[in-house]
Amino acid sequence: MKRQRAIELDRVKKTMLNIDWDDALGDEEVPELEIIATDKIPPREPTLSGYEPAVSVRSLRDNELDDHLKRQRSLLTRLGDKLADKGEKIRNRIGELEYEKQRRMFQQRTKMQDADNGCQILEKPKSSDVFMRASTASKDTSGQGTSGSKDVSRSTFAAHFSDNLKMGPQPVKLVNDKLQDLGRGSWISKANRDSIIEKNNVWRSLPRLSKCKVSLKNFYSESKDPKGDRRPNEAYGKGKPNESSPYLLVDDDDGDDDKVIGYETPRHWSLKASPLQSSSCRKKSDDKVINLDEDEPLSPMVVEEACELPEGLPEDIYYPSSDQSDGRDLVQVSLKDLKCLSPGEYLTSPVINFYIRYVQHHVFSADKTAANCHFFNTFFYKKLTEAVSYKGNDRDAYFVKFRRWWKGFDLFCKSYIFIPIHEDLHWSLVIICIPDKEDESGLTIIHLDSLGLHPRNLIFNNVKRFLREEWNYLNQDAPLDLPISAKVWRDLPNMINEAEVQVPQQKNDFDCGLFLLFFIRRFIEEAPQRLTLQDLKMIHKKWFKPEEASALRIKIWNILVDLFRKGNQTD
């Protein structure tokens, strides 16, 4: 029966479908595609690295590009296996930086060839050459053997392709469908479209990228650079906050001068208050601890507006003033030092040393705890490591010379000693806690690192050796009247505790200096006059919100601008 039915179906008469192709296609000729270089370039897609506030690789100078590469490789080596994504974002960032470095080399070589040949039109390299150069440059970035650093997207190719279109309008014959699709720019409007795979050019399938809802804007509203020139994108815009960000990112105006297609430029940004969410433990008056598994909204964090940098400011200022200090802790800050307070920049020693003195002389000038603290500057730890590792025959004389760093101060009479550490393009903090006479638990060393990047055991060992050397030196003289238990002082080399604490972690790779400064400030606010081992519980992962530390960038900027203005009035 089934066979008979199948035969009957085969006997059904098949008719031909008639299509009027002339009516369907029309008589109009398809115009030849022209690619025209314009002044305004569409905004780029989000960076492959996933860091929205990342520094634009195009805006970096050559030496800054090398510094960023060095830092990213160091981060990948130390933290790659510890991160949730196994360092994928860092490898992508390394790939972008390596490609930008190769692009500059290629552009410079092309210009030199044009100068030799007297040509005015740049020769367009083959697409395969471009991608093979980029993939070769990415192979040596991480040394991890993964494919993350070898990735080159079509967005990157578009950026290179558009750089060479600086001549007038001219017809271009596209080679194939892939380039035709790229030339029309249709790939830009398809935010969820997978990147095309080209195996022979070492492409790989990239994850789907959602279109960036907001762009970044410099928080310097109508600010000027140190020379008085007005910065681009000066006025604040209005935009909607990114829900996943603790900041309110302000959208840019149409006057975007970025000249790169293909991925998001970290434009100038503005920080405003935005509601945050986090899980927390709240302690009620009856000492009952309630753990909240679900996230709860927190009150908005108030962030200052960055003030304008006026013209005609002095080149340098000195802090603190002569009436606040005897001159031994004087810090010099120049206008060019303010650049490190730009978004995405790493804080430098002059700014960090300034804010440490500012906290000491202004914020906590009347605080008893701060008054009994000693603050070393950012250059001290390097000298400390040299002193404790010195192997010469004049070791004692070398240490006596090293003691000039705290001449006139008896360190063991202090409550706390703060030592900033700068190694491997990263900042962390050591706090030495001196107990009182009733506490026989010994001295305590705390290391606070917002990335966990610095070798804690090595730092503990260096600081211990430093304290033992100072103890040996002081024990040569008559007994001292110190606020330390006699039992602890007699056996001090063996009475030094290492406190392993967990602290809030930064959400990027450039706020480590801000976290160092916020560690100092928050510690002085909450620490007792003399710390015990039981007091260490105040330091934990939820000690403060990372956004609070990041917000110091604008605070310090405003403080310094105000001091420069006052310095100008004094002059």
UniProtKB/Swiss-Prot annotation:
Protease that catalyzes two essential functions in the SUMO pathway: processing of full-length SUMOs to their mature forms and deconjugation of SUMO from targeted proteins. Cleaves precursors of SUM1 and SUM2, but not of SUM3 or SUM5. Able to release SUM1 and SUM2 from conjugates, but unable to cleave SUM3. Protease activity mainly directed at deconjugating SUM1 and SUM2 from their target proteins. Regulates salt stress responses and flowering time. Redundant with ULP1D. The gene is ULP1C. Keywords: Hydrolase, Nucleus, Protease, Thiol protease, Ubl conjugation pathway. One of its GO terms (molecular function) is SUMO-specific endopeptidase activity. Disruption phenotype: No visible phenotype in terms of overall growth, salt sensitivity and flowering time. Early flowering time and salt sensitivity in ulp1d/ots1 and ulp1c/ots2 double mutants. It comes from Arabidopsis thaliana (Mouse-ear cress). The N-terminal regulatory domain is not required for peptidase activity in vitro. GO terms for cellular component: nucleoplasm; nucleus. Its EC number is 3.4.22.-. GO terms for biological process: protein desumoylation; proteolysis; response to salt stress; vegetative to reproductive phase transition of meristem. It is found in: Nucleus, Nucleoplasm. Belongs to the peptidase C48 family. This is Ubiquitin-like-specific protease 1C. The active site is at 426, 449, 512.
